[in-house]
Amino acid sequence: MVISNSIKTSVPHFVISDISLSDFGRKEIKIAETEMPGLMALRDKYQSEKPLKGAKIAGSLHMTIQTAVLIETLVDLGAQVKWASCNIFSTQDHAAAAIADRGIPVFAKKGETLDEYWQYTHYILDWGSDSPNMILDDGGDATGLLILGSKAEKDLSVLDNPSNEEETALFSSIKSKLQVDGSFYSRIKSNIIGVTEETTTGVARLYQLQKQKSLPFPAINVNDSVTKSKFDNLYGCRESLVDSIKRATDVMIAGKVALVIGFGDVGKGSAQSLRGLGAIVKVAEVDPICALQAAMEGYSVVRLEDVVEDIDIFVTATGNYQVITKENLVKMKNEAIVCNIGHFDNEIDVASLKNYPWENIKPQVDHITLPSGNKIILLAEGRLVNLGCATGHPSFVMSNSFTNQVLAQIELFNKSEQYAKEVYVLPKHLDEMVARLHLDKIGAKLTKLTKEQADYINVSVEGPYKSELYRY
C-alpha cells in the first residue's frame, strides 16, 4: 500500500508505503539517537542558534532509521527539508513513515521502480514557486539530475540514446518534466548554494565535473573526511556486509572461499568481516598499493578470471563498471553467492543475466540458472547488498558520517561567499571535533599534550594534531 498526502502543489507532501508504521519507526529512531552522540551533540550546541535557518535542503540519501536522525537534526537546526532515497531497495519503510508523520516531506519506499525513483528525485527538487538552495547527496544523483536536465533544456538530443534501464527511466523523467516546465532544471540549479556529497562514487563524479570546469556550484566532499571514510566505509562495512549475506541466505560463512574485488576502505572492511567469520578470503585489485596492503594483511591477491570457478562468495567493492562480466558469471560454481557493496548496480553485469531463468526466492534474493546448469544466488539485483538485504551500517558509525554532513551543510550555507565552484573537504579541526564527540560513548579517554610536547611537534595543545597530508 503506497500512501501519498497531497498539498497545494503538483508535488505530494509525502509518498511512502504505510503511515501506520510510524510508531514503530519512532521507537527505533529513539534507540538510534542513543547511539548517535555526534548528531545529538550538534542539536544541543546549535539548538538556539539555528545555523540552518533559511536552508532549503533537497536530500537524496538512503531513507533509514539513522538517516531519520540526520533529517530531524537538520530540521532542529532550522532547515526545511525534502527527502528521497538514493537507492530503490534501501528505504526502511517504518523510518520513512516516522518522518512523514512529523510533517517532513519524504518520498521513499522499499522496492521502488526506476520510474518512481526518478520521480521522487524530482520531487525533492520541486518546491513549487520556491526552490531548494542546498543539496545533500549520496552518489550524486540529485546533482547529476540538475546538470543533465539543464543540458537537455538546450539540446534534447542528449536524451536520445539511453544505454541501460536506469538511463531509460532517467531520460524519460526529464522529458516529462520539460514538457510542463522547460526551464525547471536551470532555474533550480541557479538557486543552489552548494552540495555536500556522502559517498566515494558521488565524490568521483564531482571531481570529474571540476576537472571539466563544469561544476555548477561549490561542493564539500564529506566522504574523504577521515571520520567518514575510515569509519563508515571500513568499520561500517565490516559489520553490515556479513549481516546482509546471512539475512539473505542463512549460509554458513566459515569455511567458504570468498573473493573481495577492490581493497579500498570498503573492501578492507568487507574482507575483515568475512575473515572474522572464518571464510578463506582472497582479494582482486588493480592498484598495486592496495594489492600490497592486502598481501601484507595475509590475503591471497588473485585475478578474478583465475579463480572464478572456485569462489563461494563474490563481493564487489570497487565503484567501477562491470568488474564481474558475463564471461565471469557463466563460469561460477553451483550456488555461488554474488553481491555488491559499492554504490551503483553496474559493478556486476546483471543485464547479461536477464536472458537466463530467474527464480525469486524472497525480496532481493534471486536464483539464476546459468547455461551450465549451475545456479547462482544474486543479492539485491547487484545493488547495495547491505541496504538491500539488511539495514545498512550501525547507528554509531553513521553518527560519524552524518555529523560531518551537518557540519558541511552549516559551513557551506553560512560561508558560501568563501567557496568557489570547486570541491572541498572539511578542515582538520572539524574532523577531530567529530571524533571527540564520539569518544565518551565508548568510554575512551584522551591523553592531553603538555605545552612543551605540543611545541616539540609543532602543534597546538588543542589540535589539529596531524597535517593535511597524514593518511591515518
Swiss-Prot record:
Chain residues that bind substrate: 64, 138, 198, 228, 232
Domain of life, source organism: Bacteria
EC number(s) per entry: 3.13.2.1
Xref: InterPro entries: Adenosylhomocyst_ase-like_sf, Adenosylhomocysteinase-like, Ado_hCys_hydrolase_NAD-bd, NAD(P)-bd_dom_sf, S-Ado-L-homoCys_hydrolase_CS
Keyword Zinc recorded: no
Subcellular location: Cytoplasm
Pathway annotation: Amino-acid biosynthesis; L-homocysteine biosynthesis; L-homocysteine from S-adenosyl-L-homocysteine: step 1/1
Cofactor(s) recorded in Swiss-Prot or TrEMBL: NAD(+)
Keywords attached to this entry: Cytoplasm, Hydrolase, NAD, One-carbon metabolism
Annotated family: Belongs to the adenosylhomocysteinase family.
Protein name: Adenosylhomocysteinase
Source organism per UniProt: Prochlorococcus marinus (strain MIT 9215)
Native organism taxonomy: Bacteria, Bacillati, Cyanobacteriota, Cyanophyceae, Synechococcales
GN (gene name): ahcY
